[in-house]
A protein has these predicted regions:
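Glycine-rich and polybasic anion-binding loops at the starts of cofactor/ligand-binding domains
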Residues: 1-179
Length: 179
């Protein structure tokens, strides 16, 4: 089975194991339709004429890898932004790690998207900005959106300055041959 078909076939199982807000669900469904129609980009597309994805799409991937990584702070601390105080949102193999993250609501919001979606006060901001920067008809953007489980929500009000840098850190353990 080709990777595109494997992804499309597995999306229903992905949906069933993901608890997600209705707003996000709508974005994911529309994105899946775009990916289904366009598939992976090929060299026939001007922007991809010098890049072949054949070596990527012709592999067998674990689409839903196990995420029992056991990573501890001592394993990843050296990858954080120097040794200064920052707000951190950390993901391990695509899964949020509350133990490695340091978020805030001290006059600004640095938290998980799901946490922001659960609060009515954030709805106007999310409706105005969420998923606006993505090129919606680009197939790889659509694929990423279709399988999105979680994200970071950062809101800094006008005339407010974050006292600490904000880091969004993604670690891949390499334990699974994940896409």
């Amino acid at each position: 089975m080709e990777l595109k078909e494997k992804l499309l076939d597995s999306h229903l199982a992905f949906e069933e194991q993901s608890e997600v807000n209705e707003t996000i669900q709508g974005f994911r469904t529309r994105a899946l339709r775009v990916f289904e129609k366009k598939g992976f980009p090929t060299r026939k597309i001007e922007a991809w004429k010098y890049t072949s994805l054949a070596s990527v799409v012709n592999k067998n991937y674990a689409l839903f890898p196990r995420t029992d990584s056991g990573i501890e702070l001592k394993h990843v601390k050296r990858y954080f932004l120097y040794d200064i105080d920052t707000y951190k949102i950390v993901f391990i193999d695509g899964i949020y790690s509350p133990f490695l993250s340091e978020t805030t609501h001290d006059g600004l919001d640095v938290c998980l998207l799901s946490a922001a979606l659960s609060k009515q006060k954030y709805k106007p901001i999310i409706d105005k900005y969420f998923n606006k920067a993505a090129v919606k008809d680009e197939s790889l953007t659509a694929l990423n959106t279709a399988f999105a489980k979680e994200g970071a929500y950062i809101y800094i009000p006008k005339n407010k300055v974050s006292e600490n840098p904000i880091e969004i850190v993604h670690f891949s353990t390499g334990e699974q041959k994940a896409l």
